[in-house]
């Protein structure tokens, strides 16, 4: 599905009956979470709350509440096509050397298409139609959700944060939640390994006394949002990748108060800065783990300016015990990850991040095993190849006769092909999600790999069991007279 901006995407979803307008008054304080959660768990549509009490702005939720809508946001019609996007990323990340002139010529369209999707810079952008500055800046006028009863304050959840480190031309995009502190202040919660945090660390080293410019986009088009959470190779900007997904170049405009760029069609943009040394305790908040997270200090984001379109739409979500919107997004992105992994490790048959494992804390991998110890190599590969799997605590490796997405298959393999002592790998003192309160130290914990493959000589001294299967000719013979047995 091709679209130009968020509003065009909303209109097309509505025409397909994949978006529902809610005209009944629903409060962003807790009530929207209940409605959105019930609809998401039933596989229902995206929601546009048009009557938000005490606010003059509609709220969009559940935009990516089904895998189908994630695929549509990536310009595709089905989840199957997301594998092709993964293959595109794999080709751009590590292109194969051409096998000859004909092969080199066939690769030119892909390269040309990527180069032609460089962002287009414009002035007079829609997102700057209205400007709030100085005393006009008031974040409390935005219908920011309070998602759970124990949340300390309203929380921006779909903020697309743009930063740039010193001496860098490429801008970084990331999704970081932001706690409302006051009319012009938010807390920027980003983990130390994320792009925005790394830019800020580099800035503080280079300019220890100077303010760090930041821009936050609320209500970008889906392709730009999805590009920010996809493992785009360093050779391609997120904006160029968004253009590839959308089928047209991303239109960017320069912020009014700094030299960062934001999507021209964005609904709302927050411009401001981080002051070195200015931090505040963030949380607690209900999170995607299904628990409230502990309180930690993060930088304070001072908002100097708010710009927006005519009649802006506020884009929001909630996070909680799966399934939630990030979990659905994780299921879709799982399909994008597979070709990236297979490019580097062709023996991988399937890779699955179960949503009930918070979409990243547990991975099941099936492989065509080729030698003793092969499963352990794959464990290390998962933990190290893509930064998205840095926090994956458990990796289960099975043979390719096992369905990675069927727990009955996986549990059967674990209980029949594993010896707990021989086939379990423990790695201590590794990076762990700060939200993982089960780890003994915040941000540092252990990982477990489980080898549920059949064992080869060198891995066992015993004769290995042969799986039970029925003869094919017997199956065919019984199937031929099955309808005569009076059985369903």
Swiss-Prot record:
- So where does Mn(2+) get bound? 172, 238
Question: Mind telling me which InterPro entries this protein's record contains?
Answer: UbiD (IPR002830), UbiD-like_C (IPR049381), UbiD-like_N (IPR049383), UbiD_bacteria (IPR023677), UbiD_Rift_dom (IPR048304)
What are the subcellular locations of this protein? Cell membrane
**Co-factor: note:** Binds 1 prenylated FMN per subunit.
- Keywords attached to this entry: Cell membrane, Decarboxylase, Flavoprotein, FMN, Lyase, Manganese, Membrane, Metal-binding, Ubiquinone biosynthesis
Task: List the EC numbers from the record.
Answer: 4.1.1.98
One GO MF annotation is: 3-octaprenyl-4-hydroxybenzoate carboxy-lyase activity
Recorded metabolic or biological pathway in which this protein acts: Cofactor biosynthesis; ubiquinone biosynthesis
**Binding residues annotated for prenylated FMN, in chain numbering:** 175-177, 189-191, 194-195
What are its cofactors?
prenylated FMN; Mn(2+)
Coiled-coil regions, chain positions: none
Active site residues according to the UniProt entry? 287
Q: What reaction gets catalysed by this protein?
A: a 4-hydroxy-3-(all-trans-polyprenyl)benzoate + H(+) = a 2-(all-trans-polyprenyl)phenol + CO2
Membrane protein topology class: Peripheral membrane protein
Q: Does the keyword Secreted apply?
A: no
One matching Pfam family = UbiD_N
The processes (GO biological process) annotated in the record are:
ubiquinone biosynthetic process
The primary site where this protein sits is membrane
Cellular component annotations (GO), alphabetically ordered = cytosol; plasma membrane
Q: Which family does it belong to?
A: Belongs to the UbiD family.
Complexes and interactors: Homohexamer.
Its biological purpose is as follows: Catalyzes the decarboxylation of 3-octaprenyl-4-hydroxy benzoate to 2-octaprenylphenol, an intermediate step in ubiquinone biosynthesis.
UniProt-recorded name of the protein:
3-octaprenyl-4-hydroxybenzoate carboxy-lyase
| Taxonomic source organism | Legionella pneumophila (strain Paris)
Instruction: Please name the gene that encodes this protein.
Output: ubiD
